[in-house]
Structure formats: C-alpha cells, structure tokens
C-alpha cells in the first residue's frame, strides 16, 4: 500500500493530491476557527467585490454614453417646456445635467457603507458588527460623548475636603 505524502508544507494542493479530500493548510485552519457569521461575512465580501468589479467595468463602459447624452442635452436649447413633456422626461433631463463626479459620490457612499458592514461581519467580536455604518457610528460617538459629559459633571459636583 503506498504511503501518503507528507503534507506539512503550506500547500493545500498536497492534501488534495494525497487523496484525503480535505484541506490541511493554514487557510483551512483559519476557516475552521471562524464562526458561521464570520464565514458568511468573508463570502459576502468576496461576492460583493466580484459584483462591484463587474459593475465598475460596466459603469466605465457606459461613461462614454453618459457623456455623449449629457453633451447632447446641453447642446439642445429648448426655448420653453413643451406641453406634451412628461414629468419622467423632465426628471431624466435634469438628472443627465448632473456631473459624473456627483453621480460617483452618490453611489460611492452607500457602496462603502455596505462594504464596511460586510467587512465588520468578519470580526470575531459580534458587538463590533455595524459600527462602521454612519448612523450607528454617529449614535455610538454621541452616546460616548454624553457619557463623558455626565461623568465630568459628576466629578465637578464632588466637594473637596480640606484637611
């Protein structure tokens, strides 16, 4: 019977080649040390980055189309709004006149918030999940500030006894 190869190296391919069917490298050990929430957090981060790479490619492919439509909109000089113009057409015309950097900022803030939330799910301490979301972060900071003010007021009320 052939002896299985020594899998003490850092390679996971060695364990697959040995026929054991299980990973035994440091990645597998780190994965087994995580709880379910952390594993799902890392899977979510990976899928989110993959989807954002696809969206990033798509956005920069349509950036040229957006610029062309915006230029066409600026070059047209309608004297007065037409009677048959719907509110959706009017809204589309106004939104196309916004610069691309503004659209980038509008979409970047929720994107970063979602990424930071998924990344916070990978933390070992479940109490730290969600601290990076702006409303929660502001609430925590305000709560800490109020606790500090309350503590400093209590200290100032203490009377010093001269001996």
Curated annotation (Swiss-Prot):
List keywords of the entry alphabetically: Golgi apparatus, Membrane, Transmembrane, Transmembrane helix
- Cellular localization per UniProt: Golgi apparatus membrane
Q: Which InterPro entries match?
A: LYSET
Q: Which Pfam families match?
A: TMEM251
Please list the coiled coil stretches: none
Tell me where it mainly resides. Golgi
Please give, as recorded in its UniProt entry, the membrane topology of this protein.
Multi-pass membrane protein
Cellular component annotations (GO), alphabetically ordered: Golgi apparatus; Golgi cisterna; Golgi membrane
Query: What effect does gene inactivation have here?
Result: LYSET knockout mice display increased lysosomal enzyme serum levels and storage materials in lysosomes. In addition, LYSET KO embryonic fibroblasts are resistant to infection by EBOV glycoprotein (VSV-EBOV).
- Is Transmembrane among this UniProt entry's keywords? yes
**Does Transmembrane appear among the keywords?**
yes
Its GO biological process annotations read: intracellular transport; lysosome organization; protein catabolic process; protein targeting to lysosome; regulation of protein stability; regulation of vesicle-mediated transport; response to virus
Membrane-spanning residues where?
A: 40-60, 98-118
What does the sequence similarity comment in the record state about its family?
Belongs to the LYSET family.
Report the PANTHER family cross-referenced here: LYSOSOMAL ENZYME TRAFFICKING FACTOR, TRANSMEMBRANE PROTEIN 251
Q: What does this protein do?
A: Required for mannose-6-phosphate-dependent trafficking of lysosomal enzymes. LYSET bridges GlcNAc-1-phosphate transferase (GNPTAB), to the membrane-bound transcription factor site-1 protease (MBTPS1), thus allowing proteolytic activation of the GNPTAB. GNPTAB is involved in the regulation of M6P-dependent Golgi-to-lysosome trafficking of lysosomal enzymes. LYSET is thus an essential factor for maturation and delivery of lysosomal hydrolases. Plays an essential function for cells that depend on lysosomal catabolism to generate nutrients.
Per UniProt, subunit arrangement is: Interacts with GNPTAB; this interaction is important for proper localization of GNPTAB in Golgi stacks. Interacts with MBTPS1.
Q: What is this protein called?
A: Lysosomal enzyme trafficking factor
Annotated organism of origin: Mus musculus
